[in-house]
C-alpha cells in the first residue's frame, strides 16, 4: 500500500522515494530532522463490518524504549455509520491496574469502556495510551502517526485462519 505519483515528471515515484530525494523541500527541515525519511502520517479507511479488537498504542517514549520506533496517536473521522454503530474510547470509570488485568483475563474489559454512538462527521482524538476500538457498522477515516505498534488487549475470542485465538498483548 504505497502512495504513488499518478502523472507528471515524477509519475510512478513512491512517496518514500520523493521523501528520500526531496525531503526538506517536501516536508520541511524540522519534520525531516525528527522523522528522517519516514512520512510521519498514515491514513487508513476502515470499513468495519464486525467489532474490531480492543487495543492501545504506546506513546513515543515507550515505543522508542521497547521497539526503537515511534508511538501512535490517532484521530478518527466518521465518514459513515449504520444506525446504532458505536466506537469505544477510554474508560467509563476509574479502574486500578489490578482490576484492568482481571477484566482482560476474564473478558469483561468492554464493561468499563466508554461507548459513543456515532454519526457521519463525528471526530475522535485518541492520544497514545488510550484504550479504544471501532464497532461494527462504522466507516472511519483514521489519521495516525506512522507506526505499526499495536497492543491488542481483547479480541472477542475470535480465531485466526488456523483456528487459534489471536495473540493478545
Say what each PLM segment does.
Residues 62-63, 84-89, 95-100, 127, ...:
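Short, well-ordered, mixed-charge alpha-helical segments that flank or form enzyme active sites
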Residues 1-95, 156-169:
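Transition-metal
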Amino acid at each position: 500500500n504505497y502512495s504513488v505519483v499518478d502523472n507528471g515528471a515524477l509519475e510512478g515515484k513512491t512517496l518514500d522515494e520523493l521523501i528520500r530525494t526531496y525531503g526538506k523541500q517536501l516536508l520541511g527541515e524540522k519534520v525531516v530532522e525528527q522523522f528522517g525519511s519516514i512520512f510521519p502520517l498514515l491514513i487508513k479507511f476502515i470499513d468495519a463490518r464486525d467489532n474490531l479488537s480492543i487495543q492501545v498504542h504506546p506513546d513515543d517514549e515507550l515505543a522508542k524504549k521497547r521497539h526503537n520506533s515511534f508511538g501512535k496517536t490517532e484521530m478518527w473521522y466518521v465518514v459513515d455509520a449504520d444506525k446504532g454503530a458505536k466506537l469505544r474510547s477510554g474508560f467509563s470509570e476509574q479502574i486500578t491496574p489490578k482490576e484492568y488485568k482481571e477484566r482482560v483475563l476474564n473478558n469483561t474489559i468492554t464493561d468499563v469502556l466508554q461507548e459513543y454512538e456515532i454519526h457521519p462527521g463525528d471526530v475522535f482524538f485518541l492520544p497514545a495510551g488510550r484504550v479504544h476500538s471501532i464497532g461494527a457498522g462504522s466507516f472511519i477515516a483514521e489519521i495516525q502517526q506512522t507506526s505499526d505498534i499495536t497492543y491488542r488487549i481483547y479480541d472477542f475470542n475470535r480465531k485466526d485462519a488456523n483456528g487459534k485465538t489471536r495473540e493478545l498483548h
